[in-house]
Amino acid sequence: MFEEPEWAEAAPVAAGLGPVISRPPPAASSQNKGSKRRQLLATLRALEAASLSQHPPSLCISDSEEEEEERKKKCPKKASFASASAEVGKKGKKKCQKQGPPCSDSEEEVERKKKCHKQALVGSDSAEDEKRKRKCQKHAPINSAQHLDNVDQTGPKAWKGSTTNDPPKQSPGSTSPKPPHTLSRKQWRNRQKNKRRCKNKFQPPQVPDQAPAEAPTEKTEVSPVPRTDSHEARAGALRARMAQRLDGARFRYLNEQLYSGPSSAAQRLFQEDPEAFLLYHRGFQSQVKKWPLQPVDRIARDLRQRPASLVVADFGCGDCRLASSIRNPVHCFDLASLDPRVTVCDMAQVPLEDESVDVAVFCLSLMGTNIRDFLEEANRVLKPGGLLKVAEVSSRFEDVRTFLRAVTKLGFKIVSKDLTNSHFFLFDFQKTGPPLVGPKAQLSGLQLQPCLYKRR
């Protein structure tokens, strides 16, 4: 045997770098060639055994129970704080899957790796690097063939391989999987509301007269909505609405004719078209019905406090409501007849004798341009001291005093007046005698404003 100090010192380095390729020195002679080869082989085997005992390869890592316990102590479990739904789905997974990817190396680890790299170039790796390699080998999904190649490499190649095997750092702009977002109470209500809207959007509209149908069961079949009925109902509603608008337009036209012309022209209009008076009366009643107090009811209340023997003449009676409300005998006059008790005539010329009635009533009937003729006719049929009651829309009076002075010139005096109502004024006059002025005298106070209705 011969001493070989150089081989003994270089053995650890060769063990760290990889498999040693033996190159024996050239033999001095052909005779000693076989013996020297055997000696070299024995030396190499001894060196290999020594290197394997000092630096066990990372490939021969056995998942023994002791290593598992050490790994569990060093790498504690990381609790996952996902939502309840995510926790239920992840209960069956392994504990190693619960752990996140290995954290990125810090600056200290990078420096330590550089030092280890230098030590690997010099001769050997530290024990801490071996442990770190074992952990990375267990966690990283690397094939066995690639792992064997990377373990044997040292130097710059080994450093590049370790950097490529490390998990990449997550950039701040990159999106990471997040646990499912839980909805707030307001968002949940909005979502339910949108669902109901989408559900009702495709349901057919129900007819208002019909009750909501019961929900169909699995056995019963859903009958299609009859389109003809809904179409006819809509058409009928449209016709009724158009007819109502047409009636309103005709009422406004008739009302304008009554206030802008004499009573004789209005009488001819209703004689030619009897239905026009019915239409006008229906529109008039719909307007007066909205008032808090109707003037005919107020006049009837006053007359009920007087003797029932007094004879009453109702100029412009309409539907004879005053005659139906009191016990007194009543003469009803109007341009058209809505009741058998009505006498159709021009109110400027009623078929009564002179001084034959005790009370004359004009309830919203001073219409037309010849109001003076109406009041002179009332003076003719009233007894001396008879009562004249006038109720008219308050908006028609520009000046109440001028109206009262004009009426007194026609043979009356004012007894009482009520201007408190917001819709109409009520006056009581008493006959004092015949008119004080001639028929050609002009009385400007009797020119009232026409009561015109606006389009609604």
From Swiss-Prot:
Q: Where in the cell is it found?
A: Nucleus, Nucleolus
Which residue windows does the record flag with biased composition (Polar residues)?
143-153, 161-176
Q: Does the keyword Iron-sulfur apply?
A: no
Question: Could you say which EC number(s) this protein's record lists?
Answer: 2.1.1.-
Q: Which GO terms describe its cellular component?
A: chromatin silencing complex; cytosol; eNoSc complex; nucleolus; nucleoplasm; plasma membrane; rDNA heterochromatin
Q: Keywords, A to Z? A: Chromatin regulator, Methyltransferase, Nucleus, Phosphoprotein, Repressor, rRNA processing, S-adenosyl-L-methionine, Transcription, Transcription regulation, Transferase
One GO molecular-function entry? methylated histone binding
Using the UniProt annotation, give all residue ranges assigned to the region (Disordered). 1-39, 52-231
Chain residues that bind S-adenosyl-L-methionine: H281, G316, D334, D346, M347, C363
**Basic residues bias spans:** 183-200
Enzyme superclass (EC): transferase
Modified sites of kind Phosphoserine: S62, S64, S104, S171, S176, S223
Gene Ontology process terms (BP): cellular response to glucose starvation; energy homeostasis; intrinsic apoptotic signaling pathway by p53 class mediator; methylation; negative regulation of cell cycle; negative regulation of DNA-templated transcription; rDNA heterochromatin formation; regulation of G1 to G0 transition
Question: InterPro entries under this entry?
Answer: RRP8, RRP8_N, SAM-dependent_MTases_sf, UbiE/COQ5_MeTrFase_CS
Role description: Essential component of the eNoSC (energy-dependent nucleolar silencing) complex, a complex that mediates silencing of rDNA in response to intracellular energy status and acts by recruiting histone-modifying enzymes. The eNoSC complex is able to sense the energy status of cell: upon glucose starvation, elevation of NAD(+)/NADP(+) ratio activates SIRT1, leading to histone H3 deacetylation followed by dimethylation of H3 at 'Lys-9' (H3K9me2) by SUV39H1 and the formation of silent chromatin in the rDNA locus. In the complex, RRP8 binds to H3K9me2 and probably acts as a methyltransferase.
The entry describes its oligomerization and partners as: Component of the eNoSC complex, composed of SIRT1, SUV39H1 and RRP8.
Q: Which family does it belong to?
A: Belongs to the methyltransferase superfamily. RRP8 family.
PANTHER family reported for this sequence? RIBOSOMAL RNA-PROCESSING PROTEIN 8 (PTHR12787:SF0)
Identification of the protein by name: Ribosomal RNA-processing protein 8
